[in-house]
Amino acid sequence: MTIYFDMDGTIADLYGFDGWLSHLRAESVTPYAEAAPLVNIGELQLYLSILQNRGYKIGVISWLAKGSSKSYDKIVRKTKKNWLRATFPEIHFDEIHIVKYGTRKDYVAKDKFGILFDDDEEVRKNWRGLPINPNMKDIIEKLKEIKELTD
């Protein structure tokens, strides 16, 4: 079983970055690089480590900016991966997919029936596994529940 996370609006506060949209339109990676985490880093790393030790895999599926150029996409992919490494240094991500805006996430996931935390309603509707709205259910609380099921 794989637990997937969206980045923007789920674990990274892209939309809370002042002027995020104008930065993206100007093809600046600053909002991606400087986005604050939306989760407690220590707790997320703790529960994901426990779950990985119990056989779960951890993945990220995140979109690139809408209507962006190929050169900007390349820089954004690198920036998002760097953000993940810097923000969650203790997590080994089994999969990281940074894909074109609008790509169906269930098409790129290796585990088509995994768990997905994503703030986008349309993405959750198309997900074949268990979709979770991080705005309705706290990520850490849900990970605790999953851990308890494996105790």
Q: Which residues make up each language-model segment?
A:
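Conserved Lys-Pro-Asp/Glu-containing loop-to-beta segment of HAD-superfamily phosphomonoesterases
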Residues: 2, 97-122, 127
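Alpha-helical substrate-recognition element adjacent to the catalytic core
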Residues: 2-87
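A short acidic, amphipathic alpha-helical/loop segment
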Residues: 43-50, 107-109, 126-129
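Acidic, Mg2+-coordinating phosphoryl-transfer loop and its flanking beta/alpha structural elements
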Residues: 114-151
